[in-house]
Amino acid sequence: MNSKMEKLEKNVIKFEITVDESKFNEAVIKSYNKNRRRFNVPGFRKGKAPLNIIKNYYGVGVLYEDAINFCIDDTYPEVIKENDIHPVAYPEIDIVTLEEGKDFVYTAKVTVKPEVELGEYKGVEVTKVEYPVTDEDVENELKGMQEKNARIELKEDGEAVEKGDIAVIDFKGYVDDVAFEGGEGKDYSLEIGSGTFIDNFEDQLVGLKKDESKDVNVKFPEEYGKEELNGKPAKFEVTIKEIKRKELPALDDEFAKEVSEFDTLDEVKADIRSKMEKANEEKAKIEFEDKVVDAAVENAKIEIPEVMVKNETDQMLKELESRLRYQGLDLKSYYEYTNSSEEKVRDYMKETADKRVRTKLVMEKISEVEKVEATEEELKEKAKEMAQQYTNKDLDKMAELVLNSQRSMIEQDVINGKVIDLLVENAKVVE
């Protein structure tokens, strides 16, 4: 076997690969052995006709399809390895010579990973945003805890709906006096003032009493998400079934003891502040890291092959499908609900897919230039972190299983983390 390499347009390489006649004949024999039981030749039991008889009876071409595949499977990976090529897609194969008694010649045109020309990545200037925790933030969090621990009780007959109440309602919606799909509900609990329903729907229920009905007139937002409802005026027939009030507990030391391990409300507030500060610090850290990486990517020069963006879009679509499945949905229902289609979603994802590909390539190039590697100890530590998501028992054993099954991904994750640390350490914070 020998090969010739030709560079075509950017990131595309064409190989002409010649397979010796003897090697191709071996592939034909292999094809014969694989397919012999398919052939019926008069005078021979099925599968027993010799190779030369099969050639004469059916023509040698009947064995070529598998023989070609055997040859390509044997030679193409070898050529790729010899030339240190990194394909990003399957090759485009064309047959040049396919004749009995001659060498088998084919071409393989393949898109390869693009070269990355790094720009400035050390010392990039990036703004860092701080997120201080205010007294209002703490109070809002405390109010949330108060809401979660509210006592719900039925209001007396004759009492009217007020802001903050929970109204249990039946409703049916109409557009142009025609009931629309998804516009009906029974025994629906609606907190008045929560903004759960559109427009001023909830406000129009204030003042109603149990068993009273009312036509509620609203207008759907222009971008509601369903073409047949976008921007349309609608009427809802609403009946009040029950009215409940929320009794909020007093925010005092007794409340603190009931909802936490602390004895005083001040201790609860201090704990809330501490947790929020840690969360905000992590948020600021991640944002800063993202900005540093984005700057390095923006400063680099890369010509991304379209196929890489397509492959990344395919991956993003699979990730979306997986998330939807977890919620009991599928892509078809998602497209219907969002008034979209696979083509529209792909177009929407394309920019993000391009950025993900660029970021991956730049991170790889920086790790190569800076000789960033992952030690065995770092891999084990990362695997242990991941194992904790699955179990707390036999953690070392689970970590070993995780590392064995996902070693490549874990290694890349560790290396990326070290590259980010390097970029952050060398970044210049500007106001």
Curated annotation (Swiss-Prot):
Q: Which GO terms describe its biological process?
A: 'de novo' cotranslational protein folding; cell division; chaperone-mediated protein folding; protein transport; protein unfolding
| EC id | 5.2.1.8
| PPIase FKBP-type domain sequence ranges | 164-249
Q: Name one GO cellular component term.
A: cytoplasm
Query: What broad class of enzyme is this?
Result: isomerase
> Which Gene3D superfamilies does this entry report, sorted A to Z?
3.10.50.40, Trigger factor ribosome-binding domain, Trigger factor, C-terminal domain
Q: Where in the cell is it found?
A: Cytoplasm
Q: Kindly indicate whether the keyword Isomerase belongs to this entry.
A: yes
Q: Which UniProt keywords apply?
A: Cell cycle, Cell division, Chaperone, Cytoplasm, Isomerase, Rotamase
**What are the protein's GO molecular function terms?**
peptidyl-prolyl cis-trans isomerase activity; protein folding chaperone; ribosome binding
Reaction(s) catalyzed by this protein?
[protein]-peptidylproline (omega=180) = [protein]-peptidylproline (omega=0)
The job of this chain, per UniProt, is described as: Involved in protein export. Acts as a chaperone by maintaining the newly synthesized protein in an open conformation. Functions as a peptidyl-prolyl cis-trans isomerase.
Task: List the HAMAP family.
Answer: Trigger_factor_Tig (MF_00303)
The family note in this entry says:
Belongs to the FKBP-type PPIase family. Tig subfamily.
Entry remark concerning the domains of this protein = Consists of 3 domains; the N-terminus binds the ribosome, the middle domain has PPIase activity, while the C-terminus has intrinsic chaperone activity on its own.
Protein name, per record: Trigger factor
